[in-house]
């Protein structure tokens, strides 16, 4: 039996519903911004619970522009967690600011207890990550930010559809970034991103800056960039937006089954699930003893698994210039040696889940 990690070939089997909408778009010749983009931005804003949403061509640019909209520049410091994807730290570096890492916690989120110790006079922004579709306690983070008069940018790239009590990730910070990469809960056929804010002035700046700084066809208000989302992608996004909650509920059901079965095994540590927090399970991660050998065993048995990630950000080559070294963040470093990501997507059936659990149990016998 095969248990695939990637599910995109299943998602796009029903091509007719996409082709019908693409045909309308082609007939309209609206290939740059226009009504298709505006429609998706409004629908997404309503779904998340924000006043303004500004689409971009990917989540990385959404992060960069979010930081730039708050004036982050050379000489500033931005605090973030050291166990995220490269784009989180890369966006800070792209603005010329210094990356200040803090450790993760046992749920793989930013360790809130470490944030205040990392704050200096140069700290401009706290950048928490909603890692793997789970969330840190954003209310606590916002209290710290308010205390020190620091801005917050949420990396909610994996947080679409999640909930912190009744609120969505990406609605707490000043400006927040989302991703619609193919392996996200809400995705497009390629890359896509979104920036969300309730600030009218910031939203106006972002709309101009992401489109060369144009006021209209003949006038510029600033030098900007071109990071526009393509209208072709909104066709996929609008269809997926109608289905995203159903997709997430199926992933939650699969994750709950894995939790129930794997928590019995003393060789496996499942992260705490917080009451009244809805996780999207963009990734299903746990700590496994003998992780590397288990990974080989599962792959041999046709179960595709991944590691997110074997080298934390502070130990990556670009971090050497900042002066980080092994031992600086022990929790994240331990997790990098033990974490394994199992398939949990909405197209898995119960037999595949049971097979995966059995093979994990067989390995530890």
Residue ranges and their predicted role:
Residues 8-9, 20, 36-43, 47-53, ...:
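PLP-dependent aminotransferase class I/II
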Residues 1-30, 35, 343:
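N-terminal "arm"/small-domain region of PLP-dependent enzymes with the aminotransferase-like
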Residues 178-179, 193-198, 238:
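Short beta-strand-to-turn element immediately C-terminal to the catalytic PLP-Schiff-base lysine
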Residues 30-77, 91-95, 101, 167:
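Phosphate-binding glycine-rich loop
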Residues 64, 68, 90, 117, ...:
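Short, well-ordered alpha-helices that flank and scaffold nucleotide-derived cofactor binding pockets
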Residues 54, 79, 100, 152-153, ...:
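Structural detector of well-ordered beta-strand residues that form the stable sheet scaffold
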Residues 154-189, 216-221:
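Conserved active-site segment immediately N-terminal to the catalytic lysine
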Residues 68-156, 163:
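PLP-dependent aminotransferase-like
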